[in-house]
Amino acid sequence: MTDKKEILVHDMSLRDGMHSVRHQFSLAQMIELSTALDEAGVPLIEVTHGDGLGGHSVNYGFAAHSDREYLEAVIPRMQQARVSALLLPGIGTVDDLRMAADCGVHCLRVATQCTEADVAEQHIGLSRKLGLDTVGFLMMAHMLPAEGLLEQARLMESYGANCVYMTDSAGYMLPEEVREKVSALREGLADETEVGFHGHHNLAMGVANSVAAVEAGAKRIDGSVAGFGAGAGNTPLEVFIAVCERMGICTGVDLGRIQDVAEDVALPMMDAPTRIDRDSLTLGYAGVYSSFLLHAKRAEANHGVPARDILVELGARRTVGGQEDMIEDVALEMSRARSASA
């Protein structure tokens, strides 16, 4: 690639990283990591419960603090970085959206299953009305062909989204698929509508897929310092920044500082270092929503069925985010079937 490109990188460690610590970030940890990212030059940082605004619940897990407390702790301390919040319609509400805007959130990302963009109309419309940088976020994008994904992206654009993301929530995609789908969005949306890519590292393709997305026209790329995130983590931001420097892609992030943030700040906060184990590898191989990993491990402990087997079955059933309750059902069903055949 010879053309000089400028992209906007978006750190997920304080939102997607919530999944890997059971949503238990303290306010002090939030402040420490966000200010370190800010000082490293990261321009956009996401802060909410792992499942977005309103995720603090029995179904998705109670966080150590409310979304408001996290946002109010982080936003006033930012020197150059802006803060985003994620909202999944059906989990987060318009009241949650207004609260985030009142706290000073700059960017709101409205996430839906890739076939259900129509449920985002109200939230995208309100976000634009409030003057926020408004992003449509199409999850589990491997489940739709490029033309279907473009149709859904156009809906989000028509509701007012100024950027639409193609989201590899399962870490399932390979670079050629990313290139094809990002190209379809870039060619099919208005020139002024930006395209973004969000990857997971379950098949170790996060960086390669993100590079493919940039080459295909993506302007925004998500990553997570030290890969802090669900499953085997998100695209490791410090690695992606290094690759961008090698390729002449401008991010505005200081490579040395972001390496230090990963090593000295993020890693000590992890319950265990993010890595590709057999269960997270299965997420990518079977195309399963990355945040299902800890739920599947708990189901394994409860029912004696290996998490890997549960995840494969969830993939075969084409489960999506929001169907966390099915994990226990599937595990119980498999346990009973094995007992009956014993």
UniProtKB/Swiss-Prot annotation:
Entry's EC annotation: 4.1.3.39
The keyword Metal-binding belongs to this UniProt entry's keyword annotation: yes
Gene3D superfamilies (UniProt xref): 1.10.8.60, Aldolase class I (3.20.20.70)
Residue intervals of the Pyruvate carboxyltransferase domain: 7-259
InterPro entries attached to this UniProt entry: 2-IPM_HCS-like, 4OH_2_O-val_aldolase, Aldolase_TIM, DmpG_comm, DRE_TIM_HOA, PYR_CT
Site (Transition state stabilizer): R15
Family annotation (Pfam families): DmpG_comm, HMGL-like
Chain residues that bind Mn(2+): D16, H198, H200
GO biological process: catabolic process; L-leucine biosynthetic process
Alphabetized GO MF terms: 2-isopropylmalate synthase activity; 4-hydroxy-2-oxovalerate aldolase activity; manganese ion binding
Active site as annotated: H19 (proton acceptor)
UniProt keywords, alphabetically: Aromatic hydrocarbons catabolism, Lyase, Manganese, Metal-binding
SUPFAM superfamilies with a match to the protein in the record: Aldolase, post-HMGL domain-like
Residues bound to substrate: R15, D16, S169, H198, Y289
Membrane-traversing stretches: none
Catalytic activity: (S)-4-hydroxy-2-oxopentanoate = acetaldehyde + pyruvate
Family that this chain belongs to: Belongs to the 4-hydroxy-2-oxovalerate aldolase family.
Protein name: 4-hydroxy-2-oxovalerate aldolase
Species lineage: Bacteria, Pseudomonadati, Pseudomonadota, Gammaproteobacteria, Chromatiales
